[in-house]
């Protein structure tokens, strides 16, 4: 601004040029400041370990969706709601390529949790228009915090990853059930029930399984049911398998964690856990596996040294459960905390979960 004042009397053209230069300088300084902030956040949270991983993630709708996705609540159109009232479900507007199955939207009201939310279901190739999924195995698919359930299907490209495995007979046909995890936005539920808070655990462990069995006609809960998730959903998946092995015979945590991650977004959960040691224990996957182990543990724990959010927590969990059977680590190099990493891990994860599921229908 001092340059502008000293030049003020030297002609309009000079003033315009200097003003433009000042404006450009301000814009550039803001861009550099934002770039620096992004680099600091990326350094601390490990979204993109390399420039190439950043370039690969550019195809995502929002590569930061696991932790920064604005809540959409999975809003449904009037036409979709009309179809659901008539036949119980509506086809999603965005479908996978032909031959890769079909996405269906449902609205589920949980009696025990008091929650009503969207559930997306993927019907495998050959079962797209079946009245139900009689006898098929089930995989629950759980997304991250603040990422609406719609992202679980589309950003993960779930159908495009799962369908080729079925066609090549590497895994049996199965139904993917994708319930809304974020049932009380903007509060992060941590998949936990607690007094005065949302009954998020009951929604996932009781209501949605009961609905899936009744509505979809799938095989009964047990060895042929499994659950996978990433980030927050990875914690939920690990906890559901450890605490509900009679429902979920196997589980997979992709760059998740293994005990509640409490902060300003989790409401009163931190104080509740501090006052209630029993709830704190029931929410700790390592404690559950050490003290109340399933008859048969089958848990996959995927992480990457490049992921600052999950690597240390996963190593701590593996150390705390060392010697316990049925826990399989999966290390992926240079995998940031992005949909790109979870997409790439999906084929190996599904093969792990469905290896012994078999196919009956």
Describe the function of each predicted region.
Residues 1-361:
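Non-catalytic cap/lid and distal C-terminal segments of serine-dependent acyl enzymes
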């Amino acid at each position: 601004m001092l340059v502008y004042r000293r030049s003020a009397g030297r002609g309009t053209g000079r003033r315009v040029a200097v003003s433009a230069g000042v404006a450009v300088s301000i814009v550039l300084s803001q861009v550099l400041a934002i770039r620096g902030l992004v680099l600091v956040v990326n350094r601390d949270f490990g979204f993109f370990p390399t420039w190439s991983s950043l370039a690969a993630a550019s195809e995502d709708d929002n590569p930061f969706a696991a932790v920064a996705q604005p809540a959409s609540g999975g809003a449904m159109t009037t036409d979709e709601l009309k179809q659901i009232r008539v036949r119980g479900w509506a086809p999603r507007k965005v479908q996978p390529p032909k031959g890769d199955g079909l996405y269906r939207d449902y609205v589920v009201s949980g009696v025990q949790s008091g929650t009503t939310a969207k559930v997306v279901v993927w019907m495998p190739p050959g079962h797209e228009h079946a009245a139900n999924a009689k006898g098929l195995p089930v995989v629950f698919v759980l997304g991250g915090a603040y990422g609406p359930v719609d992202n679980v299907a589309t950003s993960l490209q779930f159908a495009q990853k799962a369908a080729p495995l079925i066609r090549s007979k590497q895994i049996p046909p199965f139904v993917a059930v994708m319930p809304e995890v974020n049932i009380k936005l903007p509060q992060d539920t941590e998949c936990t029930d607690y007094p005065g808070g949302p009954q998020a655990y009951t929604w996932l462990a009781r209501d949605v399984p009961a609905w899936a069995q009744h509505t979809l006609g799938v095989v009964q809960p047990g060895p042929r049911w499994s659950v996978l998730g990433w980030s927050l959903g990875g914690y939920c998946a690990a906890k559901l398998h450890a605490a509900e092995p009679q429902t979920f015979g196997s589980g997979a945590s992709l760059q998740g964690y293994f005990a509640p991650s409490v902060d300003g977004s989790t409401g009163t959960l931190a104080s509740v856990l501090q006052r209630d040691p029993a709830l704190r224990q029931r929410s700790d996957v390592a404690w559950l596996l050490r003290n109340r182990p399933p008859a048969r543990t089958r848990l996959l724990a995927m992480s990457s040294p490049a992921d600052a959010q999950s690597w240390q927590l996963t190593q701590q969990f593996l150390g705390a459960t060392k010697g316990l059977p049925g826990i399989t680590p999966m290390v992926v190099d240079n995998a940031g905390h992005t949909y790109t990493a979870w997409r790439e891990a999906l084929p190996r994860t599904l093969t792990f979960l469905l290896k012994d599921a078999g196919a009956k229908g």
